[in-house]
C-alpha cells in the first residue's frame, strides 16, 4: 500500500471513530432524559419499570388527597377510570392542583407500586388536558364521565346565580 492511500485510510478511520463516539454519547444522553408516559392501568399491571423515571397521568380521585400535618408530603390517587395508582409527592403542589383535575406526575415507581414523584404538573386552565392523559381517559371511557361531570357542575353554578 502506498503512503498516500495509507494516510487516507487513517484519516477515514479517525473520522469514523469520532462519529461513532459522538453518536454513542448522544444516544446515552438521550436515553437518560427520556421519560415514557404510563397510564395508571399500565402501572397497576406492572408494565412500568421500577426505579426508572417515568411520567404518569390521569384524574386525581375525589377524596384521595392526604396531606401530612407536619411535612410537605402529599399522597393522592390518580385514576384513568379502570385503575388507580398512589402518588407520593414531597413539596408544594401547583396552585391549580385539586381533586377531579387532570395531572401529570414525573417520578419513579417503587417496589410497592407507588409512584414517588419529584414533579407534579397540573392543567394550566380548565379546558386543557395533556394529550397522553386525554388518550388514556378516552380509552377507559372515563373522559365522557369527566365531561358530563364538568357540564353538570357548570349548570349548577349557572342556576345558583
UniProtKB/Swiss-Prot annotation:
One of its GO terms (molecular function) is metal ion binding. InterPro entries: CcmE (IPR004329), CcmE-like_sf (IPR036127), NA-bd_OB-fold (IPR012340). GO terms for cellular component: plasma membrane. Residues 30-161 are periplasmic. It is found in: Cell inner membrane. Residues 1-8 are cytoplasmic. Pfam families: CcmE. Heme binds at residues 124, 128. The chain crosses the membrane at residues 9-29. GO terms for biological process: cytochrome complex assembly. Keywords: Cell inner membrane, Cell membrane, Cytochrome c-type biogenesis, Heme, Iron, Membrane, Metal-binding, Signal-anchor, Transmembrane, Transmembrane helix. It is a single-pass type II membrane protein. NCBIfam families: PRK13165.1, PRK13254.1-1, PRK13254.1-3, PRK13254.1-5. Belongs to the CcmE/CycJ family. HAMAP family: CcmE. Heme chaperone required for the biogenesis of c-type cytochromes. Transiently binds heme delivered by CcmC and transfers the heme to apo-cytochromes in a process facilitated by CcmF and CcmH. This is Cytochrome c-type biogenesis protein CcmE. The lineage of its organism: Bacteria, Pseudomonadati, Pseudomonadota, Gammaproteobacteria, Pseudomonadales.
Amino acid at each position: 500500500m502506498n503512503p498516500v492511500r495509507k494516510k487516507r485510510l487513517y484519516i477515514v478511520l479517525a473520522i469514523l471513530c469520532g462519529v461513532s463516539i459522538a453518536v454513542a454519547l448522544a444516544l446515552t444522553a438521550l436515553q437518560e432524559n427520556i421519560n415514557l408516559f404510563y397510564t395508571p392501568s399500565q402501572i397497576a399491571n406492572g408494565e412500568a419499570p421500577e426505579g426508572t423515571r417515568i411520567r404518569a397521568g390521569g384524574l386525581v380521585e375525589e377524596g384521595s388527597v392526604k396531606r401530612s400535618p407536619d411535612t410537605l408530603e402529599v399522597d393522592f390517587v390518580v385514576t384513568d377510570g379502570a385503575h388507580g395508582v398512589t402518588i407520593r409527592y414531597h413539596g408544594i403542589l401547583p396552585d391549580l392542583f385539586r381533586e377531579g383535575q387532570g395531572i401529570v406526575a414525573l417520578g419513579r415507581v417503587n417496589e410497592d407500586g407507588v409512584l414517588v414523584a419529584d414533579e407534579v404538573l397540573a392543567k394550566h386552565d380548565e379546558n386543557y388536558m395533556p394529550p397522553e392523559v386525554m388518550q388514556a381517559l378516552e380509552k377507559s371511557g372515563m373522559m365522557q364521565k369527566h365531561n358530563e361531570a364538568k357540564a353538570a357542575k357548570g349548570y349548577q353554578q349557572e342556576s345558583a346565580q
